From Swiss-Prot:
A single cellular component GO annotation: cytoplasm
Matching InterPro entries: Acyl_CoA_acyltransferase (IPR016181), Leu/Phe-tRNA_Trfase (IPR004616), Leu/Phe-tRNA_Trfase_C (IPR042203), Leu/Phe-tRNA_Trfase_N (IPR042221)
Catalysed reaction, written as an equation: N-terminal L-lysyl-[protein] + L-leucyl-tRNA(Leu) = N-terminal L-leucyl-L-lysyl-[protein] + tRNA(Leu) + H(+); N-terminal L-arginyl-[protein] + L-leucyl-tRNA(Leu) = N-terminal L-leucyl-L-arginyl-[protein] + tRNA(Leu) + H(+); L-phenylalanyl-tRNA(Phe) + an N-terminal L-alpha-aminoacyl-[protein] = an N-terminal L-phenylalanyl-L-alpha-aminoacyl-[protein] + tRNA(Phe)
Protein name as catalogued: Leucyl/phenylalanyl-tRNA--protein transferase
Top-level taxonomy: Bacteria, Pseudomonadati, Pseudomonadota, Betaproteobacteria, Burkholderiales
Keywords, alphabetical: Acyltransferase, Cytoplasm, Transferase
EC numbers: 2.3.2.6
């Protein structure tokens, strides 16, 4: 039975109390209270995250199974590999980290998505993650072409663990480029797992898979207390982590043609 948190001092419950698979709201473990950095840090360290709609109290979740992306298992399709090779070689194309976090989280909250009428990133959540970003725990990976932000993602870092939150794309493959950059950064910094929270076919096609809650929480216990990466700068040398030079040479079309093509509505 989910726990009602009446006060910011109320502790989050044991995740074993989360509603089970097959219930009306599987994974729901608690409701209520605040979104302070202290509360968020407590939650994420235990594999719990907030997710709710307008008009609802803050809802806290710990799904079982859990969708994760082992960075060693990231799948690069032939077309994405070609795009990344062109992108990484072009001086007017770059990945930036934390250059415009506010724009990234705003775009994640407002970009229309197929099959969704609204957003789960409520204004209170935007404010909470922005505050946590200022404290150094939340980061954005951003796809820039010719000085324009075309896609990106943001997520939480605790120790040697990264929790993906949301992504957006305003041009074909722009969010995939940001995700590939995150994977490369994680490989370079001994972060083995990216939390994806819940299953989607899109993430599954990129190598994400489900693990049970005990396995996920065991990984957190080993990683979140470690020293986090110190340098949150994306260097072009990070692309070598993806071994983009393998396979046939890409066709000669320009990066600008690929990266500035508008995304399908």
């Amino acid at each position: 039975m989910p726990t009602w948190l009446a006060s910011p001092d109320d502790p989050l419950p044991d995740t074993r109390h989360a509603l089970p698979a097959g219930s009306e709201v599987p994974g729901l473990v608690a409701a209520g209270t605040d979104l302070s950095p202290r509360r968020l840090a407590e939650a994420y360290a235990r594999g719990i995250f907030p997710w709710y709609s307008a008009g609802q109290p803050v809802l806290w979740w710990s799904p079982d199974p859990r969708m994760v992306l082992p960075v060693a298992e990231f799948k690069l399709s032939h077309s994405l590999r070609k795009t990344l090779r062109r992108f990484s070689a072009a001086p007017h194309c770059e990945v930036r980290i934390d250059h415009d976090f506010a724009a990234v989280i705003h775009a994640c909250a407002t970009t229309p998505r197929e099959g969704q009428d609204g957003t789960w990133i409520q204004p209170e959540l935007q404010a909470a993650y922005t505050e946590w970003h200022r404290l150094g725990a939340v980061h954005s990976f951003e796809t820039w072409v010719d000085g324009r932000l075309l896609g990106g993602l943001y997520g939480v870092n605790l120790g040697r663990m990264f929790f993906g939150e949301s992504m957006f794309s305003h041009a074909t493959d722009a969010s995939k480029i940001a995700l590939a950059a995150l994977v490369a950064f994680c490989r370079a910094n001994d972060i083995a797992l990216i939390d994806c929270q819940q299953r989607t076919a899109h993430l599954g096609s990129l190598g994400a898979r489900e693990i049970d809650r005990p396995a996920f929480e065991g990984h957190l216990a080993r990683t979140v207390a470690q020293r986090p990466p110190e340098d949150w700068t994306y260097h072009r040398s990070h692309w070598t982590q993806l071994r983009l030079d393998t396979g046939p040479d890409p066709a000669s079309s320009s990066v600008t043609e690929i990266s500035l093509r508008p995304a399908a509505p």
